C-alpha cells in the first residue's frame, strides 16, 4: 500500500522521535538559562557565565542529535530553548562586562536573538527597581536608557509578522514594561526632590 511503499510510517516515527528529543532538550536549556539569569540578578556573574557555557554546549549537542534523526523536522518547538538562552546571554551582557561574540551570536536564529534580547531588556525592569530601592537612581536611569535602545532597535525591524515570528507582539510587550519602569523612576525622582526640599526647609527653620 501507499503507506508502506513510501515509508510514511518511518517518516512520522523519525519526526516523532525528533520532537520528543527536542522538547526534552529544550526544557533542559530553558532551565539552565533561567538559573543563569537568577545568578546574574544576584550579581554572581561567574556562575551565570558558567551556566551560559553549559547551555551553549547543550544547544550544540541538541542540534546534532536532531539532525541525526531527521533533517526535515520542523524545529519551531525547539526555538523556545534558543530564545531563553539568548535572553540569558543578553541579560548578562547588559548587567556585567560579559562580551558578546560573533561565535555565540551565530549559534542562534534571528528570531531567537531578537526575542531573547527583548526579554532580557524586560528583565532589566527588576534590576532597575532594585537600584531604586538602593536609592541608586542614576543606575536605574541607565538601565531605562538601555531598555529604550532595545525598543528602538526592535521597532526598526520592519518585516511581516510571518517572517519575524511574532516580534511585533514581543516589542509591544517590552514597550509597556519600559513605560511602567519610566513611571516608577519618575515617582522615585519626585520623591527624592520632595525629601530634599523638606530637608532644606527644616534646616532653615532650625
Identify the meaning behind each predicted range:
Residues 51-105:
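Long, charged all-alpha helical bundle/coiled-coil segments in cytosolic proteins
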Residues 1-8, 12:
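Single conserved hydrophobic/aromatic residue that forms the stacking wall/gate
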Residues 5-6, 19, 86, 92-116, ...:
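Intrinsic, low-complexity N-terminal interaction/targeting segments
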Residues 40-47, 132-138:
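Short helix-adjacent coil turns
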Residues 26, 52, 59, 144-147, ...:
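Inward-facing hydrophobic residues that define packing positions of alpha-helical scaffold repeats
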